[in-house]
Each structure stands twice: as structure tokens, then as C-alpha cells.
Amino acid sequence: YSLNKLRRDLEILYYFYLEISARKTAKELNIDYGVVHRKFMQFRKLIAEYCNKQARKLNGELELDESYFGGRRKGNRGRGAKNKTIVFGILERKGQIYTKIVENVSAETLMKEIENKTKKGSVFYTDGWKSYASLEQYGKHNIIDHDKELVDKNHNHINGIEGFWSFAKERFHKYHGID
């Protein structure tokens, strides 16, 4: 590994840290886009591996929700989830979050993730989606009815995870998605 390659990779890492796109980084540094794109993918993979190694079961007050990622389809009416990526998330109000791409939002799929990633006895907040019906076996289940109010007098809400979805979608939009 040469000193020049190390210097180049550190410059690419700096642009990655600044959240500058791979295309713009390649142009700014006068480096082939393919090289920059591969490095960005390596950085993302390393971050994901690090996060997985640090993972622990979430506990305490947990907000659960699912979200659909993917661009709007021209000609399709409504919000349809067809051809979109489903992401399930668990937000621990103390600060950690777990997300995973899932094939569907069935009870079997979501409850498996909940069982594997949360400690029994936690307090769960959901939007009342039918797949969460058996959540009581893992802890206290509070259902949030957005039709009534966003936050009730007992601070029951899922605003944290919904804010995270908004943040994530804004980030992915900036990069036109992430491979």
C-alpha cells in the first residue's frame, strides 16, 4: 500500500465524512468515480460491521414502526408500497436504534425481530398495526392512536422513530438511495 494511495483514501474518507456525494468527490479530487464509489461502499460496510459488533438487546421504552423507502412511481395514485423497500425499526428512547430491511410486515416477521432484538419486560409503543397484536407477551404494549392526538398526557407517542424515518429518507434522497 503506497503513501499516495493512503493519502488518496484519507481524502476520500474526509469527503465521505462531510457527506459529499461520490460523484462530486471524484470530480473535486480528480479521481475515477468507480474508485470513489467502491471506497464509499467499503466505508459503509465497515460502519455496518462495527455497529453489528456493538449491538445489544434494546430495552426500556421502545418505539416500533415500519417505513417504506423508494421513489414515487409516476402514474401510480396513492402511497402504494409496491416496489418499495420495507424497513422495520426499533428506537430505544435512551438513544439507540435498530433497523432492518424486511420482506413483509407480517406478525411472524416483525415478532421474530422484536424477540431477537429486545429484552422482555420492555415498554413498547406502536401505531396499533395488527402485526403487533401479540406484543404483550414481551412487555407492556401502548398503542398510539394518531387520529386522537400525537402525544397523550402520559407521553405515549412514536414521534422519535417517525422523526428518524424522516431524517433517513432525507439522507437517502440526497444520495438517490444507497446500494
Segments predicted by a language model, with ranges:
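Residue-level recognition of single "structural anchor" positions
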Residues: 1-179
